[in-house]
Amino acid sequence: MPRLKTVLGSLGLAALLLAPPLSAEDGGRWLERMAQAVKEQSYHGSYVYERTGMFTTQDIWRQVDTSGSRERLLQTAGRHQEWLRHDGRLVCTTSSDLKRSRSPGRSSAPLIDSQQLADVYSMKVYGETRIATRPVTVVAVQPRDGFRYAHELYIDNETGLMLKSLLVDDKRELLERFQFAAISFDAPDYQAGLEPSSVCQEVIITDIPAATDVSFLEPAWLPPGFSLSHRDVQTMRDSEALITSQVYSDGLASFTLFIEPLVGDSLAEDLRAQLGPTVAVSRRMVTADSLFLATVVGEVPPRTAERIAESLEQTMAEAAR
């Protein structure tokens, strides 16, 4: 499918982005508020997600209290799709392939350190507008290098929750749009839809034996500002093979490195694919006694993902010495 060619100017945003900032206020403070709201805010809303000319609409219910967080997503058009998460862990879905997992680290919303973020992004506040009838502040986040994309964030003035985001490449092509059409912070609204439907399949999480030998492969190169935020070990349905995943983030952008063992006659090949902002780069890796597939998936430019994947060969060479 052809890439969406819409540029920021045709979205009516050119004047906003090209004009000087309306405020000298540090955009980093708004990003810190946004990160805090992701962890603490309860709400119910309906939003539109767009990438590469394709649209999906979803409802979300999210409740955060002293016992943790619960979140349910429901696709409202097309095939029924549903996801339920407790404390960030997927516990129910209509398309589950997971069989079991062991998590050496706890997944959580990224902590945004505005000073560290300023090393790799420039952040500017560009005034106010409205999203879903609510006043929001617009923060433009521009990368200082070519290893990540630009963001335009519309942050709710009252709660700090992000109500709209645009992801833009270095040619100012729109890669992704996320936008709430309606949102409520009233308890009866967000509590009403937290129970899964009858077709939502439980994701069975059982412990992989602690004695199981699990090796995580670290890339020899990471883009500046990225660091490891989470590790996990999984097996897929009808397979006992262990698949490791490692999530890296710079506070805004993130990518995941998957390592999957292969058998000798596996048809898996090197590949590069992209859908909107999401890129996937796979490399077959061979050691003296094993064969596996390393895949980098994330919302980073293709050249970034390729360099990360290529650096794994250096990691393996150093380990073999």
Label each PLM-derived region with a short phrase.
Residues 132-198, 272-275:
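Gly/Pro-enriched, hydrophobic low-complexity segments
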Residues 38-40, 62-71, 84-89, 134, ...:
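Short, solvent-exposed coil/turn segments at beta-strand boundaries
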Residues 2-69, 78-79, 116-118, 128-129, ...:
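N-terminal leader/targeting segments and the immediate start of mature chains
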Residues 202-289, 300-303, 307:
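Short, solvent-exposed recognition patches
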Residues 40-46, 67-72, 133-140, 161-164, ...:
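Short, hydrophobic/aromatic-rich segments at coil-to-beta transitions
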Residues 59-63, 127, 151-155, 178-181, ...:
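Hydrophobic/aromatic beta-strand elements that line small-molecule binding cavities or substrate pockets
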Residues 52, 56-110, 164-181, 185-186, ...:
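An acidic-aromatic
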Residues 104-151:
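Intrinsically disordered, low-complexity linker/loop segments enriched in Gly/Pro
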